[in-house]
Amino acid sequence: MDKYGILKHYFGYDSFRPGQEKLVDAILAGQDVLGIMPTGAGKSLCYQVPALLMSGITLVVSPLISLMKDQVGALNQAGVHAAYINSSLTDNQITKALAYAKQGRYKIIYVAPERLETWGFLDFATHVEISMITVDEAHCISQWGQDFRPSYLNILSFVKKLARRPIISAFTATATSKVRAVSYTHLTLPT
């Protein structure tokens, strides 16, 4: 299946919205991207479509449990095997989800940035193929990273511990120059 087949089969659309296809194509070509699109413009599809075409797992760093649950619920309803791993799960549920992911059951896994700093998750990530790391709501890196959620500033440190550097994508509706600069610096995105 190609990108159009994925778009139609899982998401029910015949064509991409303006700006989406360019980002999808860049990711599929192995390029890191920073996608800045208005709320409701379909940023999620820009990483979800490529995630389903790549061989490994896509990790989506997301700031809120409710966002993770909503995204995973919508993906599962569409027939996409996705999961979230966060503090709303018991240790047993986390262990089970990671085991399923190692077996190849999930293409997309949503996590909080703090999860990337745990030994158990790093152990998991070094034993599976991570094709892409996506930072959803990338403005959180600059807005929360300095004090409220410093784990946002450590995403690149996590990436450097992996055997192979995955594609890095980041998406936001907030396009201030500070957000762009911090995203480029802390995710090593191209300018």
Regions inferred by a protein language model and the residue ranges of each:
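Conserved pre-motif I regulatory segment
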Residues: M1-I36
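Walker A/P-loop NTP-binding motif
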Residues: L28, S44-I57
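Conserved helicase ATPase motor motifs in RecA-like P-loop NTPase domains
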Residues: P38-T39, H139, V159-S177
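Conserved Walker A/P-loop ATP-binding site and its immediately adjacent core
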Residues: I57-L75
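Conserved helix-turn-beta segment of the N-terminal RecA-like "Helicase ATP-binding" lobe
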Residues: K69-T90, Y100
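Conserved helix/coil segment N-terminal to the catalytic DExD/H
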Residues: D91-M132
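SF2 helicase catalytic motif II
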Residues: F124-R164
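Conserved small/polar residues in nucleotide/adenosyl-binding loops
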Residues: T185-T191
